[in-house]
UniProtKB/Swiss-Prot annotation:
Stored Gene3D superfamilies: HUPs
Site (Transition state stabilizer): H18
SUPFAM superfamilies referenced in this protein's UniProt entry, alphabetically: Nucleotidylyl transferase (SSF52374)
Subunit structure: Homohexamer.
Any Pfam family matching the protein: CTP_transf_like
Keywords: ATP-binding, Coenzyme A biosynthesis, Cytoplasm, Magnesium, Nucleotide-binding, Nucleotidyltransferase, Transferase
Residue sites binding substrate per the record: T10, K42, L74, R88
Reaction catalysed by this enzyme: (R)-4'-phosphopantetheine + ATP + H(+) = 3'-dephospho-CoA + diphosphate
Residue numbers binding ATP: T10, F11, H18, G89, L90, R91, E99, H124, G125, F126, L127, S128, S129, T130
Highest taxon above the source species: Bacteria
Name under which the protein is recorded: Phosphopantetheine adenylyltransferase
GO BP term, pick one: coenzyme A biosynthetic process
C-alpha cells in the first residue's frame, strides 16, 4: 500500500525549515503532497501561484513530492489526494498547543487522518516565513534561510 502524506501550509515564503520537513517526509513516505493554502481573508506577500512555483523550485530534486493549491478544509484535500497522514512541523511549545487543537478537530472531521509531528534541526528552529519576510523588508540578507530562487523572488517583491 502506498503511503501518501499531506504537508499543508501557507508557505509565504517557503523556508529552509519547510524544505527540511518536506525532504524528511519524502524519505519516510512514498509520496508527499505539499498543500499550499489559499484563504481570501489572509494577506500574503505572494499569490497562490507564486507560492506554488517557489515550492516546485525548492523541491525539484525530490521525485516523490507534488505541490497543489487548496482552499477550504484540509480534510477535504486529504480525501481528494487519498492521504490519511498529515505531516506538521513543531518548533516551539506554542506550535504544539496550536497544532494539538487542529489535530483534535481534524480527527473529529476525518477519524482515519493521523498526524505526524517533525521537529526541525537546531539551525532551523527559529525560522519562520514571517521572520524571513520582515528581515527582507527591512533590508536584511535572507539567502541563508531560503532557496536561491525564493530569495530572488523576495528581493524583487520587496523592491516593488
Amino acid at each position: 500500500m502506498t503511503k501518501r502524506v499531506i504537508y499543508p501550509g501557507t508557505f509565504d515564503p517557503v523556508t529552509h525549515g519547510h524544505s527540511d520537513i518536506i525532504s524528511r517526509a519524502a524519505n519516510m513516505f512514498d509520496h508527499v503532497v505539499v498543500g499550499v493554502a489559499f484563504s481570501p481573508s489572509k494577506k500574503t506577500m505572494f499569490s497562490l501561484e507564486e507560492r506554488m512555483d517557489m515550492l516546485v523550485q525548492a523541491t525539484a530534486h525530490l521525485n516523490n513530492v507534488s505541490v497543489v493549491g487548496f482552499s477550504g478544509l484540509l480534510v477535504d484535500l486529504a480525501k481528494d489526494q487519498q492521504a490519511n497522514i498529515l505531516v506538521r512541523g513543531l518548533r516551539t511549545t506554542m506550535d504544539f498547543e496550536y497544532e494539538l487543537g487542529l489535530t483534535t478537530m481534524y480527527k473529529k472531521l476525518m477519524p482515519e487522518l493521523e498526524t505526524i509531528f517533525l521537529t526541525p534541526p537546531e539551525e532551523h528552529g527559529f525560522l519562520s516565513s514571517t521572520i524571513v519576510r520582515e528581515t527582507a523588508i527591512h533590508g536584511g540578507k535572507i539567502d541563508q534561510f531560503v532557496h536561491p530562487y525564493v530569495a530572488s523572488a523576495i528581493y524583487q517583491k520587496v523592491k516593488q
